Regions:
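Conserved beta-strand-loop surface patch within small alpha/beta domains used
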Residues: 1-78, 86-166
Length: 166
């Protein structure tokens, strides 16, 4: 498969990183909105897993429909999803592979504890920092992911607020 690319503005990059830091030590998740492989906004979604939000995320069908509605209201298309990996690398897990849908981009951000206390306490203010961010695409045969190239564009406006819509 040819190298697939996804471009996002710096404001979207920052919004995803902040979401991961704010939800640490749990996984965050959200939708990627844009056109033609350019992400112009992200929509945070609730992580409703019952398996333990520290290692899993789940988007309910009703939240998916809400994301589609918000995407349409923003004038974009649903390009994919993002989620964080607390204290783990920004690469897909077997769980991610088992639950991925074709055609979507999957952005993963690694979020790491800044100290041992943060690793033990979800309430530690400023206790986590977003690290690597990667993008992945499900292979056509669904057997694995292919790593894509994540590019960054300039912000849409120098004074623009982070592109989180919720």
């Amino acid at each position: 498969m040819a190298d697939r690319q996804l471009t996002m503005t710096a404001e979207v990059d920052l919004a995803i990183r902040r979401h991961g830091e704010e939800t640490y030590p749990h996984e965050c998740c959200g939708a990627l909105v844009g056109r033609d492989s350019v992400v112009s906004a992200c929509v945070p979604l609730p992580n409703t897993t019952e398996e333990g939000p520290r290692r899993r995320f789940l988007v309910r069908p009703s939240d998916y429909r809400d994301a589609e509605r918000q995407t349409a209201a923003l004038g974009g298309e649903l390009l994919g999803f993002y989620h964080s990996h607390p204290d783990h690398p920004a690469r897909p897990s077997q769980y991610d592979l088992d639950h991925a849908w074709p055609t979507f981009a999957y952005v993963i951000v690694s979020v790491v504890a800044t100290n041992d206390l943060a690793r033990r306490s979800a309430e530690q203010e400023g206790g986590a920092k977003a690290a690597d961010m990667t993008v992945w695409y499900l292979e056509d045969d669904r057997s694995s992911f292919e790593k894509g190239t994540l590019n960054h564009a300039e912000n849409s406006h120098p004074d623009a607020a982070p592109a989180v819509h919720g």
